[in-house]
Amino acid sequence: MNTFKVQFFSPDNRISFDEVVSLSVNGLEGELVILAYHSPYLIYLLPGIITAQMSNQTKEKVVIDNGILEVANNNCSIITNQIQVFDHLTHDEESLKDKRVGIYLSYLDVKSL
């Protein structure tokens, strides 16, 4: 199976995936799927979720701000202001949800006094 490497760069973080089979991104021109040995390409990316289909059949999702994607020599580089692995973002949202529930329950306890 043909694969390629994807690297995300931001001022605060760097994420790298080896053995990517396909990469789905949203640019100004619409949705684009990058495959191994894609011709050289440069595109402006819109904020959103980038999905990397890995060779082991898993999917990695990364949330980005506006950015630029470059494809060259079977490598894909994405430069953006902010990057966050989607699983970590989901986990953070769950912890925030738990905190909101706790605050609400505390409010009900005080109100019932």
Curated annotation (Swiss-Prot):
Membrane topology label: Peripheral membrane protein
Gene Ontology CC, one term: proton-transporting ATP synthase complex
Subcellular localization(s) per the UniProt record: Cell membrane
Record flagged with keyword Transport: yes
GO molecular function: ATP binding; proton-transporting ATP synthase activity, rotational mechanism
Origin: domain of life: Bacteria
Keywords, comma-separated and alphabetical: ATP synthesis, Cell membrane, CF(1), Hydrogen ion transport, Ion transport, Membrane, Transport
InterPro entries: ATP_synth_F1_dsu/esu (IPR001469), ATP_synth_F1_dsu/esu_N (IPR020546), ATPsynth_dsu/esu_N (IPR036771)
Family as reported in the entry's similarity comment: Belongs to the ATPase epsilon chain family.
Function comment: Produces ATP from ADP in the presence of a proton gradient across the membrane.
Assembly information from the UniProt record: F-type ATPases have 2 components, CF(1) - the catalytic core - and CF(0) - the membrane proton channel. CF(1) has five subunits: alpha(3), beta(3), gamma(1), delta(1), epsilon(1). CF(0) has three main subunits: a, b and c.
Name of the protein in its database record: ATP synthase epsilon chain
